[in-house]
């Protein structure tokens, strides 16, 4: 991405789509998405999330229109200065207190939405660093995550996988970016 930035030119790209891939070969996709998200720290960059339009067995999503529309939103906001919600929610901060974590996001538009039922794809880990499914619910403009067994939370992940079953969106129908608070490489 750095190499495409010359002067004040804008670089807008999509983020790696959901994909199962081959075991042992494509297991680093969450880490690649994480690095892609960090690239937003580079000036004159914007990104559209394609996680929810991917195909389980094809890295190239057939739904190109949705990806294109999301890239266009990013261009309208970043290049043309339109005041609109152009990105899905991005984790800003996590407050952990005992067996509960409150996750705060940027880019929520008018609020957060759980598409197709209760929130999914949230995991928590304690001192043992073993991630387990967690209960999550929208709490105002944040998400509250709780460990199912009441154990203390040390770390939180969302949609951390090659083809996660994630469903957190903002009011503009844009999906939340996967994230993790840990630095465990698995």
Question: Predicted segments — roles?
Answer:
Residues 16-27:
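Serine-dependent acyl-ester chemistry module
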Residues 32-121:
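Catalytic cores of secreted or luminal carbohydrate-active enzymes
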Residues 23-24, 62, 133-135:
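Short, contiguous acidic/charged loop-to-helix segments that flank catalytic cores in large enzymes
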Residues 1-7, 12:
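Single conserved hydrophobic/aromatic residue that forms the stacking wall/gate
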Residues 1, 36, 146:
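Short, flexible, glycine/charge-rich loop motifs used to bind or transfer phosphoryl groups or to couple energy/partner
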Residues 13-17, 50-53:
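An acidic- and aromatic-residue-enriched active-site/binding cleft used to recognize and process polar
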Residues 102, 109-186:
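C-terminal beta-sandwich/jelly-roll accessory domains of carbohydrate-active enzymes
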């Amino acid at each position: 991405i750095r190499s495409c930035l010359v002067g004040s030119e804008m670089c807008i790209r999509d983020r790696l789509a959901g994909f199962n891939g081959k075991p042992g070969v494509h297991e680093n996709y969450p880490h690649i998405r994480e690095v892609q998200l960090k690239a937003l720290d580079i000036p004159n960059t914007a990104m559209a999330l394609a996680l929810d339009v991917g195909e389980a067995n094809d890295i190239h999503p057939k739904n190109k229109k949705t990806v294109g529309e999301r890239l266009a939103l990013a261009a309208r906001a970043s290049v043309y200065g339109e005041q609109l919600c152009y990105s899905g929610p991005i984790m800003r901060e996590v407050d952990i207190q005992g067996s509960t974590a409150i996750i705060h996001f940027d880019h929520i538009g008018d609020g957060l939405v759980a598409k197709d039922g209760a929130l999914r794809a949230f995991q928590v880990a304690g001192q043992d660093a073993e991630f387990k499914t967690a209960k999550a619910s929208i709490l105002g403009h944040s998400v509250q995550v709780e460990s199912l067994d009441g154990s203390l939370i040390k770390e939180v992940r969302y949609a951390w996988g090659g083809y996660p079953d994630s469903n957190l969106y903002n009011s503009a129908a844009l999906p939340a970016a996967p994230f993790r608070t840990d630095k465990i490489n698995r």
